[in-house]
Amino acid sequence: MSQPVKIAIAGANGRMGRAVAQALEGRSDAVVAARFERPGDAGEGLVARETALAAAEAVIDFTLPEASVALAEEAAANGGPALVIGSTGFSDEQLDRIDAAATKIVIVRSGNYSLGVNMLMGLVRQAAAALPAQDWDIEVFEAHHKRKIDAPSGTALMLGEAAAEGRGINLAKVSDRGRDGVTGPRKDGDIGFSVVRGGGIIGEHSVIFAGESESLTLSHSAIDRGLFARGAIAAAVWVKGKPPGLYDMQDVLGFKK
């Protein structure tokens, strides 16, 4: 039997850090090797970031974009460990820096680590390809808890990208994210985004295909935060032995052709 993958947890005291630690309890294929927070943060069981990186084969990181970029660059400079990044809200410049780090180490980055959402992406891509833009409008709806700081969510953007891929277009050219006041009629082919923030909503996502006489809605609801933790752990186990590069959850699940 192979040895369990040694995992370090970034942002260990956060909601997702705690969820990852809980999800690792009792597993035979992965184990907590270290827990760490931001430099200067102290707490029981926490170690310095450099100590955590040295102890781990993979780091699971649900923190903030700037922290994830710094972590990726430090890991790349040291030749590892692998990273599983679940942070969202990156700028283009930050994504470029993660891409550069992925030339030296294995990085899995995804806006959502759930099986259901990744299945939903395929359904959205298929529906978008089958339903012509002149007859069917696409709207991505998402709702999250009031503490989430980025919008649209990383998952909503993934779903928008899937819809754009299905239609063979660039999402950046058709994305409509800010409706307020007199906006005029909707443009054919636009992919709209609607956002709700409130309470303790874990994550609700729907993609609406709206025609003149009928509509189709594809949806996913997160019941508990542990599903994201379990998916990230699956990714951390999957990276073992993989060559340096940038991967996503579609790779982990074998959904890519």
Swiss-Prot record:
One of its GO terms (molecular function) is NAD binding. Pfam families: DapB_C (PF05173), DapB_N (PF01113). It comes from the Bacteria. NADP(+) binds at residue 38. The active site is at residues 144, 148. The keyword rRNA-binding does not apply. CDD domains: DHDPR_N (cd02274). Its main location: cytoplasm. Keywords: Amino-acid biosynthesis, Cytoplasm, Diaminopimelate biosynthesis, Lysine biosynthesis, NAD, NADP, Oxidoreductase. GO terms for cellular component: cytosol. Its EC number is 1.17.1.8. InterPro entries: DapB_C (IPR022663), DapB_N (IPR000846), DapB_N_CS (IPR022664), DHDPR_bac (IPR023940), NAD(P)-bd_dom_sf (IPR036291). It catalyses: (S)-2,3,4,5-tetrahydrodipicolinate + NAD(+) + H2O = (2S,4S)-4-hydroxy-2,3,4,5-tetrahydrodipicolinate + NADH + H(+); (S)-2,3,4,5-tetrahydrodipicolinate + NADP(+) + H2O = (2S,4S)-4-hydroxy-2,3,4,5-tetrahydrodipicolinate + NADPH + H(+). Pathway: Amino-acid biosynthesis; L-lysine biosynthesis via DAP pathway; (S)-tetrahydrodipicolinate from L-aspartate: step 4/4. It is an enzyme of class 1 (oxidoreductase). The keyword NADP applies. GO terms for biological process: diaminopimelate biosynthetic process; lysine biosynthetic process via diaminopimelate. NAD(+) binds at residues 11-16, 37, 86-88, 110-113. Catalyzes the conversion of 4-hydroxy-tetrahydrodipicolinate (HTPA) to tetrahydrodipicolinate. Belongs to the DapB family. This is 4-hydroxy-tetrahydrodipicolinate reductase. It comes from Caulobacter vibrioides (strain ATCC 19089 / CIP 103742 / CB 15). The lineage of its organism: Bacteria, Pseudomonadati, Pseudomonadota, Alphaproteobacteria, Caulobacterales. The gene is dapB.
